[in-house]
A protein has these predicted regions:
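Short glycine-centered segments of the SAM/dcSAM-binding site in methyltransferase folds
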Residues: 217-221
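Conserved class I S-adenosyl-L-methionine
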Residues: 117-126
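A short glycine-rich, Lys/Arg-flanked "PGG" loop and its adjoining helix->strand segment in the class I
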Residues: 204-216
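Class I SAM-dependent methyltransferase SAM/SAH-binding core
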Residues: 127-170
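A short His-aromatic
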Residues: 194-198
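Short conserved loop adjoining the S-adenosyl-L-methionine
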Residues: 169-184
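A conserved beta-strand element that flanks and buttresses the S-adenosyl-L-methionine
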Residues: 191
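N-terminal accessory regions of S-adenosyl-L-methionine
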Residues: 1-116, 129-130, 224-225, 230-304
Length: 305
């Protein structure tokens, strides 16, 4: 009850539409019947706001308004010469939340026996907050990140292997070269959370992720922001358009965006759907708002040979 009372006045801002709301309006449900694909309708698993999610929402408030404002000013200065990702890494900001430990347990349970253990790969892991939640279930973890600052943050967290790289083309070989005893056949579970709208070629990314998975048994956890509004963040802080365009709407309902991502991107590459869920993609707040949020679709997939 105490946590519920504490969060009653939270101010959360949607980073897409600028709407302001409290935690009770965070998106977890969906109009499942409106999904065009029967596979999507049948595999939808509803998650919900829980105590771990609420704890994350309160972090900015716990840090204090003055400290949040100081960090925001410093971030603005740094962004004159570098990307937001790199500035956040230097300042210890930019923590993200996609799902709680209980959420992960629900999704892994749907995958059946053998979904835990073995080796886990998190591609584009950021500062490692979500990586750590997932990594608890595995014997070994490799985290990749293209930002030097974020890669340093990952090393501080003590993951088994950290690769500073913007590609996963040779990730199994590189992990083994650094002492990781991942199978030559690939990783047991791979996560790519909110990368498809930030890379030059999302199809190439998914093909590489599929090759990094163990055939038959490997699981891919893929989170994509909906509506889909892609851009590439360059090292100097500028933005450019991806090389590859997808026929996916940049506005409209979550359901229409998910349908388009499934038919345009995911299904044609041969993935089988295990579960689909809707979760808020939460970013740590600042002196203006307690948190910022985007709308995520989480696809749990298998890649048959």
């Amino acid at each position: 009850m105490a946590s519920e009372e504490r969060t009653s006045a939270l101010r959360i801002r949607c980073a897409h539409c600028d709407a302001v709301f409290d935690e009770r309006a965070l998106p977890y449900d969906a109009d499942v019947d409106s999904l065009a694909s029967s596979a999507l309708r049948e595999k939808f698993v509803r998650l919900s706001l829980d105590s771990e999610s609420v704890e994350f929402l309160n972090r900015a408030r716990a840090r204090g308004r003055d400290e949040c404002e100081r960090l925001a000013r410093k971030c603005t200065e740094l962004r004159r010469t570098m990307s937001l990702t790199e500035a956040n890494a230097i300042l210890g900001r930019g923590k993200m939340f996609v799902f709680s430990d209980a959420h992960v347990e629900t999704l892994m349970r749907a995958c059946g026996e053998g979904a835990g253990g073995g080796w886990f790969l998190d591609v584009g892991a950021g500062e490692g907050e979500v990586t750590r939640t997932l990594a608890r279930r595995f014997a070994g973890t490799c985290a990749t990140e293209s930002s030097p600052g974020m890669a340093s943050r990952l090393r501080e967290k003590g993951f088994d292997v950290v690769l500073e790289s913007d590609t996963v083309e040779n990730v199994v070989r590189e992990t083994r070269a650094r002492g990781g005893d991942v199978s030559e056949d690939g990783f047991d579970v791979v996560a790519a959370l909110n990368l498809c709208d930030r890379v030059r070629s999302p199809r190439a990314l998914l093909r590489d992720l599929k090759r990094a998975l163990k055939a038959k048994t490997g699981i891919l956890i893929l989170a994509i922001v909906v509506p889909f509004r892609p851009f590439v963040e360059n090292a100097d802080g500028t933005r450019s358009q991806p090389d590859e365009r997808l026929d996916v709407p940049s506005a409209g309902s979550w359901e229409s965006g998910v349908d388009a991502l499934w038919t345009e991107l995911i299904a044609p590459l041969g993935f089988d759907l295990v579960t689909l869920s809707r979760v808020p993609y939460i970013s740590e707040g600042d002196h203006l708002y307690d948190a910022y949020v985007l709308d995520d679709a989480v696809f749990v997939l298998r890649a048959p040979p």
